[in-house]
Amino acid sequence: MRVMITCFPAPAHFWPLVPYAWALQSAGHDVRVVAPSGFPSPTGIISTDFAQRVTESGIAAVSCGPPTPLAVHDCDDPGFADVLPNPDETERYVRALSVHERVERDMWDVFYHYAILAIRNYQPPRPREDIDEIVAFAKDWRPDLVLWEPWFPCGAVAAKASGAAHVRTLISPDYTAWAHERFVSRGLPSMLAEAMQPLAEHHGVTVDNELLLGQATLDPIPAGMRLPTRTPTVPVRYLPYSGASVSEHWLRDEPQRPRVAISLGVSARAVDKGDSTGRIPALLEAVDGLDVEVIATLNKDQLSDQVETLPDNVRAVDYVPLSQLLPTCSALVNHGSFGTVIAGLSHAVPQIVCDTDEPTRLFGRATPDGVEWDRTSPKQGYSTLTANYLADRGAGSRLDHQKQSISEIRSMLRRVVEDPGVRDAALRLREEEWASTPTPAQLVPWLEKLAQEG
């Protein structure tokens, strides 16, 4: 059968989908990854070489439309300011939706400030040529099945317009379903439905729950990390993939001391262009003198701000795939993204998740020169969720560099590396919430049946 995969054109959104593409292609199906052509973004979040990232994985890429700025940066569009998140709107909805608890506010903030912004960027009120071309490709190629991720639901419109079966594929906790259900339960128009309406109408597609949430949802989120929603999902094992590269020779050598990885996210460093929080200097000072070997995946921007010299036990590398690094590690220090945390979980590596009590909100103000951004915190939007998930199960710890001293951070590192109870908890968590779920390859027959039934 023909399978079309669509996603927001950034590595962090594509990489989680690669194992599905491999499984389907290995079963003899024709798989294409279809996405907008890249365009340089002031925030750095869009990959201008996205098609190359796709083909590096061994999957055929289809780039659609001319390079076009995100709606939020399209100053030639008089309505571009309407796409921007703003404080008045978010607080109005927080009150209307009765979002009170800290964990619920975190869910709302990720949905409103990031997920719905991504959706609005590619589905503004005015049609976009790149998105129209994706729909046109689907109508012409006639896929049997479309896989799409929640930050790029125009894949669902392409599926409906072409008559294909379609499956929503989660790449992070299900904030869109949680928020959509919250709106519906309060009798309010769904923000997700409103964002989808212009594109759906443009292509003659009805906005309903199936369009918004898929005919089915593949869910790689461990049971203990899932958000409270009523949307049924099909559990699937998350298989980490983080790009193609040549394996470094030093990775083949057995570490002489416990190896600790520090990984703070490729998307985060693309956006932040450095470290304004003091987190990196605190981590490097804490590991200095410990009897460990540290591999820090930090680039020159992240090191140049506040780091004069690296400790003797630290090797800084711009990039190394976690799938190659983690099997050699005794601990992983990370920023709390789902992909990084589950990569660590898949190798039963004890973890320390960097998290603070700050909110994660992003506001934009239109100016004559473009957009002036105000970001309350550079932390990962759901780092509190992932940190608590690991800490509550004994497989890791939560690190708040704003409140914990260097001595406390150093003690935390020692415990995570040396305590066999933490390693045992990580092994148990791997078996119970990762290894027990079916792989993408095992779900191919189910996907084939779904596509056949339409």
Regions found by a protein language model. Give the residues of each.
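C-terminal amphipathic helix plus adjacent low-complexity
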Residues: 407-454
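Short, polar loop motifs at secondary-structure junctions
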Residues: 36-39, 46-48, 150-153, 220-225, ...
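A donor-sugar binding/catalytic signature common to diverse glycosyltransferases
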Residues: 21, 317-386
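Donor-nucleotide binding loops and adjacent catalytic segments primarily
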Residues: 236-331
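A nucleotide-sugar donor-handling region in carbohydrate enzymes
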Residues: 41-43, 190-268, 299-300
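Conserved nucleotide-sugar phosphate-binding/catalytic loop shared by glycosyltransferases and other
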Residues: 39-110
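N-terminal subdomain of nucleotide-sugar transferases
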Residues: 1-68
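Conserved nucleotide-sugar donor-interacting segment of glycosyltransferase catalytic cores
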Residues: 98-106, 110-197
